[in-house]
Amino acid sequence: MMTTDIQDGLQELDSLLSHADWQLADEVTFQIMLAVSDRRDAGWLDQSAIANFPCATLHQLDQRWLFYSSGRFGFSTQLHIYREAAERSSFEFSRQAGWVMNLWQPIGFFNFYHWLNFSLDAPQGHLPALWFWEMPWYRSWLIGGFGTGRGGGFGDPSLFDALMLRLERCQSI
């Protein structure tokens, strides 16, 4: 992705976040992530793309989400919750962030993306989320989804774990 494209995307993100348009901001965040990772054609992020995600862009995205949500949303907020939740179970973050529908305890299925709460009333760490939801239909089927992303599927923490590891490594830079 060209530097000017990144800057344009970040300016658009600033505008959306400043107007509390959380869902569109989430979509723009995902588009920036795809472009920076050279995954626009694929339309989703895999573990390799996350592992090689540029730290500078990750920090820029995170700082914007943190600033405009007063620390409620952002990758750093997710990392903080993830660290605490990991002591109990790998799926606990998803429950705390409101990403899971609790139909039967202790089993939970991921919400459909359009069921997420795109307001400041959402649980802490709820957004950004689209980067985690988007996946090809066949991967969705493999985790029990309906071919539309994570919705209705079981937990597959590998992608989220990859981003949390990348964020930890980027924080030390």
Task: Pin down the residues of each PLM region.
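Surface-exposed peri-terminal alpha-helical interaction modules
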Residues: M2-I173
